[in-house]
């Protein structure tokens, strides 16, 4: 099952470490949803092409395009630059949807009080980060992840670095959190 926790503020330690508070403060996936709007499903990464679960989610949410990304030193061109870009706090004007096929890593998301929640993703986890949420991604100590990226329409992956509080997607996100209507 997915694990999440509030993060420490130590910026001197390797970003690939867990960065748990002392004592740890776990966050359930329901709390993650309620505090950030992030959605989660656990799928079978071995049978998703046959069992229909991913296809149903795609149909229900309008995800019409997919591709696969592998992140490791030997698989991703310009690895160091990409890792820095992924870990820079940013938002997107569209949802960010990732289905983990292999490996593991961390999505850090800001909760409704602007605190970091670290979500550990592993094989079979499907996350939907809402448009307008401040977030970042890093590998863990395994230094490898393979993920399916899902999009509504043609793929757009344009990070809008913080501060971006005036961006329309941010306004809409904040309003959705206030009204409790994240879907």
From Swiss-Prot:
Its cofactor is Fe(2+); Ni(2+). Gene3D superfamilies: Jelly Rolls. It is found in: Cytoplasm; Nucleus. It is an enzyme of class 1 (oxidoreductase). Fe(2+) binds at residues 90, 92, 96, 135. Its EC number is 1.13.11.54, 1.13.11.53. Its main location: cytoplasm. Binds either 1 Fe or Ni cation per monomer. Iron-binding promotes an acireductone dioxygenase reaction producing 2-keto-4-methylthiobutyrate, while nickel-binding promotes an acireductone dioxygenase reaction producing 3-(methylsulfanyl)propanoate. GO terms for biological process: L-methionine salvage from methylthioadenosine; methionine metabolic process. CDD domains: cupin_ARD. GO terms for cellular component: cytoplasm; nucleus. SUPFAM superfamilies: RmlC-like cupins (SSF51182). Keywords: Amino-acid biosynthesis, Cytoplasm, Dioxygenase, Iron, Metal-binding, Methionine biosynthesis, Nickel, Nucleus, Oxidoreductase. HAMAP family: Salvage_MtnD_euk. Catalyzes 2 different reactions between oxygen and the acireductone 1,2-dihydroxy-3-keto-5-methylthiopentene (DHK-MTPene) depending upon the metal bound in the active site. Fe-containing acireductone dioxygenase (Fe-ARD) produces formate and 2-keto-4-methylthiobutyrate (KMTB), the alpha-ketoacid precursor of methionine in the methionine recycle pathway. Ni-containing acireductone dioxygenase (Ni-ARD) produces methylthiopropionate, carbon monoxide and formate, and does not lie on the methionine recycle pathway. Belongs to the acireductone dioxygenase (ARD) family. This is Acireductone dioxygenase. It comes from Ixodes scapularis (Black-legged tick).
